């Protein structure tokens, strides 16, 4: 039941007693008793099967009536909000103030007080109490734990009715009972032993390095601190958003980066979870679906249309497993909150009413926003829908989206009685012009009951109908009620004691009472609660002769109809009987008669779907039994495709049995077992240029297609869904000029023509729809014509060109919020416009940034402006309108380059409002004609390449790295190579944190002074650019021969491995590493003192993320990783060949395969971007330069890849996988960025395939102590040859007190040391090189002292006299043993050996005997402070629970930034991890 109320929140005062009752003569009507209140009563709640009612009043006061509203009393000593337990109707909890609450288990007769340690939470998606479906004493409690202005979510629980309250989970996003509904588990044969104790919680970080939300569970209330993640298909379900309990089903919704499609998982036993498939209608996208009122054998879901600005949905019904949904009805009406016009008739199986938008297609296309609503009813569980009939006219009724009362909209437990407000005609009119209609045969026929709209209720099992005039909106008052004693045929009226407008009319939940409650308001703003009692109208109690055996469902012939194997009957009072049933609290129960089985009693079995004729057809080819189908013409006995619906009790004897096996032909069955061979399919295309794109799949993408599109030179578009085996040519009226994949939704692609016409597909190029822009796309060089919103996939910005001259136009920006159906002007004279708002970041959701030419003149300079209302009223001009060169959005950063005379400056913002000037390294002047290239920001620092030498073909520059908020840059790598297109030889190694490769120019002076050709060396970093080193060369080449230089354990200036980088790559999408083949890197290059020309290169591979290398092929080869690295394919580069080589053991051995009978030149080799497929495409050029031939090469037939690998989380190294840890080559342990990471890798010798993308990250063994590799040089410091950081001569450290100015809440700052911690590092303890000496911020001395408290007399003795006693010896010993230099801190080795090691933080200042004393004394409070920080670390939530009602964790990114871990990290440094959030930002030129 959906509970609604139009009542305004307010306070309530019991007024002085008015006359006790207003009584009519017994024969004239009901007895009415009135209580007056000066504020509107709210939240009326009946305890079921009692006359006890509680309502809310003034300042959360609660009032109680135990005589069906005849009298009221204050609930003494208790106040707050009442939360009824809907599964245990005698139970309710009062959420009280001051952490005191109350619970009752006997309908408010007695109450038990209890306390919860923290403040309870409601709103923002959280409810304070989650009740168990079967045990009233088991309750989950939602709270928030706050300290130091920061809060996090905490869940408590009780199993003994609040006698004890214990903590369950911290930092969760909500917890749920497995048995969240009384029906859950019924009929299931295999249930967990402790199902009643099983609790699920949404957990944001299953491991500290993987911040995607999981659903975890425990049968011991997490008392052992162990959480088991829910799986589907052997993989953790990630990106969990919410969970719900619906009858016998648990439903889980999940999302992932790269698609707007949501995944729905269903379980009937709280153990096994299966993904639900939706057929025949739109996919479930985002959170846009509503689980409707469902049955024990089926789930009803309304899926919102993605296209329409006006809310419209599609109704889906599941099979009995809850995993196969079929669309029953399109165009279902819903409101902006996704409340859906759908309601089942109470107590009768298979009948429900729904309102649909008859002009849905016009509304979706934007032709109109006015919905034409019509009502429909189904009598067969949604198979068919019919109009409602009032005589010979169609009837349309207002539904849930227009509530007028509380409780159900149309019906009640009164058998067959249905009422509604509406009108006859061709569409639904307004509520105010509607009349009141009634049906006494469950909606088959209708009659007009009363003129005008009324609130209505049912009593005495339907023998009494009560209605009151309902015009609250227009404040029209009435002094009478209407009632009917014969199912609405005739109506009588009764006078009310006051002229009022009705606010609420209700009665007992089971509609068996003769007493009703009316909440009303009069013209003087007085409020009344009226008890209306009809008990004395009929003196006679009904006898057997007064009842009929009423069939609940009728077929087309008017005969009792069958559903779920039986007919349904009710014992119901005859309409004209002059008696009352008077069986209070005895709800009518149905009688059933069994039916013989018919086709309707069966549903499609797994792997089968209904067709348009309601027949079950195979969704995929049927697998034959083993040993069958040796020949295509053979036949076998296979599944029929049907199964009896579980719970259906039809009689098979004498009826239909569709479950029997049927004969099937082998040619329609699945393919034969694997052949052991690699298969090849060849397709030629007439085109000179190769232009293709994969539509990548994400974690929650449905289906299994591998879709590729190819555009030819003449504008044709070809699509393959099987990775190049078969292709289809698109049918478009105009040639396609370019395609633009949606940046944030891989399922969506846009095709643009030279004019205004464009096409879009949201189903992975299966179907295309067209629209027109306001102007043809821009021709301005370097300007993209289409921009997308990261969270609203249908929001577009279109850049159209006007007055184009060559490749220069006056560009206008338009926006659409419905995928191009409607366009509105944003700005004229723009450079580019883009959405920069993103959920989980500090920017506003609808924030747009535009660069606009002065005076809208394209010859003028650009300025940066922004707006969060589409530039209708509010426009912010940044940098006082001064010229900018460009701007870019990278992860959470907005980076802007401004031009000030001859100097180029950079600014950074994380909220789109405040820009901080980027402080570049000292003495670093950037001329205005130089270029920035933003390289990467995936580790929450910006890598920026700044050109130092722009001479054509001689470009190079410096790679700078920012702090975590992008405002302070230090030099990471000088002389980094760049080309004339602003691409840089810099590449991050995927998955493994902080590893990157770069090429530097080793003769910069000669290049600058003499114009010499650039010479290169390759460098690698393992700590995110803090340190760079030469690549270690292999010991021998692939033939076992020595190299020309002397190879050592590490790369040297004379002998190292050098690899050709990004600037020489023919296809920018190719990469040296893979996002799924962890640790594998391939490149072409040479061993020597510098990089030789590409033509002289060989091919090399690393299996340990770049620490060691080996040569795999002589000569240059192209490569691709498949099946997450279990297949590696290489093919000769830029020379004719007909052979490829592949490795199944990470490059240890190679096998040649002839893919063509003639030699061709391979232009490119490709596979899906996630590298999870066993299919590849070789894009080849035969003799003709105007033809491309695509060779699909399929490795899935190999015997070595026949079975799927086995990975068990409880024993990850027991079967086909092992655990691998990346490490730093200069460290003895496997610590990288302050932690040990463990990754699942397939054993090279295992003969199996990986299949769906693995959760590669196994977990984190531990956080490590901080070492030199966890720090980099601070601003105005530079690295010395010995690895230390020293202040640049003539400069001062950055102002350490700036943090106090920037953050009014800051209590302290730290004196500069020359070092800053890498933002991505999670190390603890060890060398705290950036936080040595703390000082109080101005006016924060008191708070500082409280944070760093002093010590008492006894402690003071040891803190002063004992250190002084040993200071001389310690200081002298340290001085004599230490060989460091004054004025700098030397970074230590991997682990501190002792407190007096040469790298100890204690020895970090000029040392004298006295300094030894000072250091020891100072260390004590600092050590305490450090320990305290490691135990607090609360995270800041956005806004107030009580104010905004905002859910604190709206997205993965938001939760990544609020992990709830007790780690002392500055807020700006908190969002460090979460590879799932990385959107694959490519280099972006500013």
Swiss-Prot record:
> Whose protein is this, by species?
Arthroderma benhamiae (strain ATCC MYA-4681 / CBS 112371)
BNR repeat ranges are 377-386, 437-447, 483-493, 718-728, 1100-1110, 1142-1151
The GO cellular component terms are: cytosol; Golgi apparatus; membrane
> What cystine linkages occur within this chain?
none
Instruction: Give the location in the cell.
Output: Golgi apparatus, trans-Golgi network membrane; Prevacuolar compartment membrane
The free-text function statement in the UniProt record for this protein reads:
Functions as a sorting receptor in the Golgi compartment required for the intracellular sorting and delivery of soluble vacuolar proteins, like carboxypeptidase Y (CPY) and proteinase A. Executes multiple rounds of sorting by cycling between the late Golgi and a prevacuolar endosome-like compartment.
Question: The organism sits in which domain of life?
Answer: Eukaryota
Keyword Plastid recorded:
no
Any matching Pfam family: Sortilin_C
Signal sequence region: 1-25
**Could you say which protein family the record assigns here?**
Belongs to the VPS10-related sortilin family.
Q: What residue ranges are annotated as transmembrane?
A: 1350-1370, 1402-1422
Q: Which residues lie on this side of the membrane: Cytoplasmic?
A: 1371-1401
GO BP term (any one): protein targeting to vacuole
Principal subcellular localization? Golgi
Q: Which residues are glycosylated?
A: 296, 900, 965
Q: Does the keyword Magnesium apply?
A: no
Membrane topology reported for the UniProt record: Multi-pass membrane protein
Protein's UniProt name: Vacuolar protein sorting/targeting protein 10
The alphabetical list of record keywords is: Glycoprotein, Golgi apparatus, Membrane, Protein transport, Receptor, Repeat, Signal, Transmembrane, Transmembrane helix, Transport
Lumenal-side positions: 26-1349, 1423-1486
């Amino acid at each position: 039941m959906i509970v609604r109320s139009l009542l305004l929140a307010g306070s309530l005062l019991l007024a002085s007693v008015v006359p006790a009752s207003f009584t009519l003569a017994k024969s004239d009507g009901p007895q009415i008793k009135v209580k007056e209140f000066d504020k509107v009563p709210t939240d009326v709640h009946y305890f079921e099967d009692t006359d006890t009612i509680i309502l809310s009043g003034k300042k959360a006061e609660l009032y109680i009536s135990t005589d069906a509203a005849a009298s009221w009393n204050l609930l003494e000593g208790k106040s707050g909000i009442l939360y009824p337990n809907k599964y245990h109707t005698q139970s309710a909890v009062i959420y009280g103030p001051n952490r005191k609450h109350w619970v009752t288990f006997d309908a408010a007769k007695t109450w038990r007080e209890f306390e919860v340690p923290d403040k309870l939470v409601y709103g923002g998606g959280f409810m304070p109490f989650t009740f168990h479906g079967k045990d009233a004493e088991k309750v989950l409690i939602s709270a928030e734990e706050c300290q130091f202005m920061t809060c996090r979510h905490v869940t408590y629980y009780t199993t003994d009715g609040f006698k004890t309250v214990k903590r369950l989970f911290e930092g969760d996003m909500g917890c749920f009972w497995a048995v969240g509904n009384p029906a859950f588990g019924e009929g299931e044969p295999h249930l967990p032993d402790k199902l009643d104790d099983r609790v699920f919680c949404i957990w944001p970080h299953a491991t500290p390095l993987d911040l995607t939300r999981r659903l975890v569970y425990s049968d011991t209330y997490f008392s052992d601190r162990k959480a088991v993640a829910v799986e589907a298909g052997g993989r953790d379900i990630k990106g969990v958003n919410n969970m719900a309990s619906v009858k016998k089903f648990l439903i889980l919704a999940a999302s992932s980066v790269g698609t707007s499609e949501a995944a729905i998982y269903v379980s009937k036993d709280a153990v096994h979870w299966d993904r639900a498939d939706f057929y025949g209608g739109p996919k479930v996208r985002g959170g846009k679906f509503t689980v409707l009122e469902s049955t024990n054998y089926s789930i009803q879901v309304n899926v919102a249309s993605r296209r329409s600005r006006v809310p419209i949905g599609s109704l889906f019904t599941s099979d009995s497993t809850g995993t196969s949904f079929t669309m029953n009805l399109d165009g279902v009406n819903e409101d902006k909150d996704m409340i859906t016009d759908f309601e089942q008739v109470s107590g009768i199986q298979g009948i429900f009413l729904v309102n649909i938008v008859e002009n849905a297609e016009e509304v979706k296309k934007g032709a109109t926003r006015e919905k034409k609503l019509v009502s429909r009813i189904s009598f067969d569980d949604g198979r068919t829908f019919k109009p409602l009939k009032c005589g010979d006219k169609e009837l349309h009724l207002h539904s849930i989206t227009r509530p007028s009362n509380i409780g159900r909209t149309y019906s009640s437990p009164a058998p067959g009685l249905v009422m509604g407000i509406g009108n006859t005609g061709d569409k639904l009119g307004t509520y105010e012009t509607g009349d009141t209609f009634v049906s006494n045969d469950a909606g088959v026929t209708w009659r007009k009951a009363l003129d005008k709209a009324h609130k209505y209720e049912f009593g005495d099992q339907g023998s009494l109908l009560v209605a009151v005039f309902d015009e609250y909106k227009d404040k029209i008052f009435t002094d009478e009620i209407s009632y009917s004693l014969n199912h609405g045929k005739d109506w009588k009226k009764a006078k009310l004691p006051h002229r009022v407008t009705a606010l609420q009319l209700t009665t007992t939940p089971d509609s068996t009472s003769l007493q009703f409650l009316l909440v009303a308001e009069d013209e003087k703003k007085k409020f009344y609660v009226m008890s209306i009692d009809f008990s004395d109208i009929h003196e006679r109690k009904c006898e057997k002769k007064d009842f009929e055996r009423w069939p609940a469902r009728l077929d087309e012939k008017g005969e009792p109809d069958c559903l779920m194997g039986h007919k349904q009957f009710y014992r119901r009072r005859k309409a004209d009987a002059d008696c009352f049933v008077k069986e209070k609290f005895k709800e009518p129960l149905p009688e059933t008669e069994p039916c013989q089985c018919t086709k309707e009693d069966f549903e499609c079995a797994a792997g089968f779907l209904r067709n348009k004729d309601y027949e079950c057809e195979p969704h995929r080819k049927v697998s034959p039994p083993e040993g069958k189908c040796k020949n295509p013409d053979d036949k076998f006995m296979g599944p029929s495709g049907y199964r009896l619906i579980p719970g259906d009790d039809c009689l098979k004897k004498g009826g239909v049995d569709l479950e029997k096996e049927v004969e099937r032909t082998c040619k329609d069955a699945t393919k034969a077992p694997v052949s052991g061979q690699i298969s090849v399919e060849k397709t030629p295309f007439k085109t000179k240029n190769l232009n293709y794109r994969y539509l990548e799949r994400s974690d929650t993408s449905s289906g299994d297609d591998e879709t590729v599109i190819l555009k030819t030179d003449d504008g044709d578009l070809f699509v393959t869904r099987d990775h190049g085996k078969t292709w289809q040519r698109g049918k478009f009226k105009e040639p396609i000029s370019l395609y633009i994949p949606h940046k944030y939704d891989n399922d969506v692609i846009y095709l643009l023509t030279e004019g205004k016409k464009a096409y879009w597909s949201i189903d992975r190029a299966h179907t295309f729809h067209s629209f027109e822009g306001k102007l043809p796309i821009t021709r301005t060089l370097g300007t993209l014509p289409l921009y997308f919103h990261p969270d609203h996939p249908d929001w577009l910005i279109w850049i159209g060109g006007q007055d184009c001259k060559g490749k220069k136009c006056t560009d206008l920006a338009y926006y659409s919020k419905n995928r191009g159906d409607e366009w509105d002007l944003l700005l004229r004279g723009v450079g580019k416009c883009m959405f920069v708002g993103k959920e989980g970041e500090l920017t506003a959701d609808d924030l747009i940034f535009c660069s606009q030419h002065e005076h809208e003149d394209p010859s003028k300079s650009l300025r940066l402006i922004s707006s969060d209302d589409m530039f209708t009223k509010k426009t912010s001009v940044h940098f006082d309108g001064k010229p900018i060169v460009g701007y870019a959005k990278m992860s959470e950063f907005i980076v802007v380059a401004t031009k000030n005379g001859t100097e180029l400056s950079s600014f950074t913002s994380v909220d789109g409002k405040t820009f901080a000037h980027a402080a570049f390294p000292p003495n670093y002047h950037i001329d205005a004609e130089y270029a920035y290239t933003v390289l990467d920001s995936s580790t929450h620092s910006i890598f920026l390449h700044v050109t130092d030498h722009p001479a054509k073909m001689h470009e190079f520059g410096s790679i700078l790295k920012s702090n975590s908020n992008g405002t302070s840059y230090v030099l990471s790598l000088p002389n980094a190579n760049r080309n004339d297109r602003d691409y840089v030889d810099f590449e991050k190694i995927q998955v493994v944190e902080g590893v990157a490769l770069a090429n530097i120019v080793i003769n910069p002076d000669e290049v600058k002074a003499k114009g010499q050709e650039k010479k290169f060396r390759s460098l690698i970093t393992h700590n995110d650019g803090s340190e760079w080193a030469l690549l270690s060369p292999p010991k021998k080449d692939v033939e076992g021969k020595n190299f020309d230089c002397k190879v050592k354990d590490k790369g040297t200036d004379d002998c190292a491995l050098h690899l050709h980088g990004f600037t020489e790559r023919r296809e920018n999408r190719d990469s040296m590493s893979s996002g799924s083949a962890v640790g594998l890197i391939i490149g072409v290059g040479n061993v020597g003192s510098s990089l030789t020309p590409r033509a002289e290169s060989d091919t090399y591979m690393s299996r340990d993320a770049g620490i060691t290398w080996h040569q795999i092929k002589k000569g240059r080869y192209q490569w691709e990783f498949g099946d997450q690295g279990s297949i590696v394919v290489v093919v000769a580069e830029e020379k004719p060949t007909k052979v490829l080589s592949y490795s199944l053991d990470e490059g240890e051995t190679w096998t040649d395969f002839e893919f063509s009978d003639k030699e061709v030149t391979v232009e490119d080799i490709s596979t899906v971007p996630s590298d999870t497929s066993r299919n590849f495409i070789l894009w080849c050029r035969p003799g003709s330069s105007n033809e491309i031939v695509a060779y699909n090469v399929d490795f899935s037939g190999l015997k070595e890849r026949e079975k799927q690998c086995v990975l068990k989380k409880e024993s990850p190294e027991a079967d086909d996988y092992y655990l691998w840890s990346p490490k730093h080559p200069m460290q003895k342990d496997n610590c990288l960025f302050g932690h040990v990471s463990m990754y699942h890798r397939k054993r090279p010798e295992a003969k199996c395939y990986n299949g769906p993308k693995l959760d590669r990250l196994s977990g984190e063994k531990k956080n490590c102590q901080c070492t030199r590799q966890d720090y980099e040089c601070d601003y105005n410091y530079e690295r010395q040859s010995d690895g230390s950081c020293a202040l640049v001569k003539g400069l001062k450290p950055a102002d350490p007190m700036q943090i106090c100015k920037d953050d009014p809440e800051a209590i302290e700052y730290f004196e500069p040391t020359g070092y800053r911690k890498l933002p991505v590092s999670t190390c603890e303890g060890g060398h705290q090189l950036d936080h040595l000496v703390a000082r109080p911020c101005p006016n924060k001395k008191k708070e500082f002292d409280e944070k760093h408290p002093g010590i008492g007399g006894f402690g003071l003795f040891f803190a002063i006299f004992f250190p002084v006693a040993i200071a001389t010896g310690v200081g002298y010993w340290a001085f004599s043993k230490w060989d460091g230099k004054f004025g700098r801190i030397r970074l230590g080795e991997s682990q501190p050996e002792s407190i007096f090691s040469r790298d100890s933080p204690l020895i970090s200042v000029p040392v004298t005997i006295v300094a030894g004393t000072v250091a020891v004394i100072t260390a004590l409070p600092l050590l305490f402070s450090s320990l305290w920080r490691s135990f607090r670390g609360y995270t800041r939530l956005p806004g107030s629970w009580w104010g905004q009602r905002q859910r604190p964790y709206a997205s993965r990114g938001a939760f990544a930034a609020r992990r709830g871990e007790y780690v002392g990290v500055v807020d700006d440094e908190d969002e460090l991890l979460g590879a799932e959030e990385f959107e694959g930002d490519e280099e972006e030129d500013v």
